[in-house]
Regions:
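Conserved catalytic core of the tyrosine transesterase superfamily
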Residues: 1-297
Length: 297
């Protein structure tokens, strides 16, 4: 194993153990960095990411654009390398930051998909969940996503000790292993506790599959997709849609943007501001019903 391979191995180990990123995210990092190494090796006979130069990154970005890669995909690839450089500089393996000053293609503004409030209400009121331990598990999972806005990776990582029934809180470890305490409704806590008592398997994790194994991304995605399609016409029905829905519905009901930022675990308020557009659009729709608007009709 070469020295550069050892550094990458240690980096991925750091992502898994210290930043607690999901398997899916780790694979994305590996794919992005492998592509970067291949390009460097083919064009500059260099396979050590610590020796990257800014002009090489610019050249790679141009190449990706020629291949008609989406701007969002290019941004993600460079973001993967940026995360690696932060790790490498902290370890004393790099001095400068070759990403600095590199201009990336402009991102198109993409509004988050959101499930309407009436659709979410019908999901919980129309008895769509089976009357069984795994039916209650599914309902608890959907409830947690909608009530807390947690990420898929955060839900999968939840353990029994993270739930505090007395304080009605849930301990969540977000990006960078940042811990936050999420308030929970008593109904949700009771649902989770009932599901745990009824399930026929012993496990240290809060949720398990039908076979008693730890949750994995595609399992949760399929469950969320199934239930949301029962009440929604959205083309994309994923756990992240429920995160968008949580944030938008809170803001629609008058929550402060800063409070929503903390609940979502965002490090920057700018990341949360995208949800304000959805609430603005709703206000515009409501304003169409204004009596003053009828003067011109």
């Amino acid at each position: 194993m070469t020295s550069s391979s050892i550094v990458l191995y240690e980096f991925f180990d750091f992502l898994k153990k210290e930043r607690r990123v999901s398997v899916h995210t780790t694979r994305s990092y590996k794919s992005d960095l492998d592509q970067m190494i291949t390009y460097m090796s083919d064009h500059y006979e260099e396979d050590d990411l610590c020796n990257m130069k800014s002009e090489w990154i610019r050249s790679w970005v141009v190449e990706l654009m020629k291949l008609n890669k989406a701007p969002r995909s290019i941004h993600r690839k460079i973001s993967s390398y940026r995360t690696f450089t932060k790790y490498a500089r902290r370890k004393g393996l790099m001095d400068g930051n070759p990403v600095e000053g590199v201009v990336l293609p402009k991102l198109e503004k993409r509004l988050p998909n959101v499930v309407p409030e009436h659709a979410m209400s019908s999901l919980f009121e129309d008895n769509l969940f089976e009357d069984s331990w795994n039916g209650r598990r599914d309902k608890a999972i959907i409830s947690l996503f909608y009530e807390t806005g947690i990420r898929l990776s955060e839900l999968i990582a939840l353990r029994l000790q993270d739930l505090d029934g007395q304080r009605q809180t849930l301990k969540v470890f977000g990006k960078g292993s940042k811990e936050r305490q999420m308030p929970l409704l008593q109904d949700t806590i009771s649902l989770i506790q009932t599901h745990i008592k009824e399930r026929p398997f012993n496990a240290s994790t809060l949720f398990i599959t039908d076979r008693g194994k730890s949750l994995y991304s595609s399992f949760v995605y399929r469950k969320v997709n199934y239930y949301l399609r029962e009440v929604s016409t959205l083309q994309k029905c994923s756990p992240h849609v429920l995160r968008h829905t949580f944030a938008t519905h809170l803001l629609n009901r008058g929550a402060e943007l800063a409070a929503v930022k903390e609940l979502l675990g965002h490090s920057s308020l700018a990341s949360t501001q995208i949800y304000t557009h959805n609430t603005t659009e709703k206000l515009k729709e409501m304003h169409k019903a204004s009596p003053l608007d009828r003067r011109n009709k």
